[in-house]
A protein has these predicted regions:
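Catalytic-core segments of enzymes that bind and process phosphorylated/nucleotide-bearing substrates
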Residues: 1-126
Length: 126
């Protein structure tokens, strides 16, 4: 986890609009995987995420990139959780800076929110 904590520290102290910063981050994470993972979670309307049911991994050794995996999606596809059903804005929920302690505390949306500050990442995500 020290590698991941180092990544988060770098992201928290960097200007995400800087292309050089984005290039550095892309050496830490599989950017395509991160984009696809977030698109999938938002598309299926997973309400038990991102602060819960989040798994990410990295191959051991030098050069391994962080990747995220989709799992435990039973609170998705419009489950009428909190009485909102299909009217819930999952994208807005996933980028809330001060979300509720469950299921999206600020730490769980931090990396995604910061990456969206970069125009290249944002363009690829959209």
């Amino acid at each position: 986890m020290s590698n991941y904590n180092e990544l988060i520290g770098y992201v928290s102290q960097s200007n995400m609009a800087d292309p050089a910063v984005y290039d550095s981050i892309s050496k830490w994470i599989d950017v395509d995987n991160h984009i696809n993972y977030n698109i999938a979670q938002i598309f299926i309307d997973n309400r038990d995420w991102p602060g819960n049911n989040i798994k990410f991994w990295r191959p051991q050794g030098n050069g391994g990139k962080w990747r995220w995996m989709l799992y435990d999606t039973d609170f998705s596809f419009g489950v009428p959780w909190m009485g909102l059903g299909y009217n819930f804005n999952t994208l807005q929920f996933a980028v809330e800076e001060n979300g509720p302690d469950w299921p999206n505390p600020p730490w769980s949306t931090f990396l995604f929110r910061r990456l969206l500050e970069n125009s290249n990442y944002q363009h690829r995500f959209i």
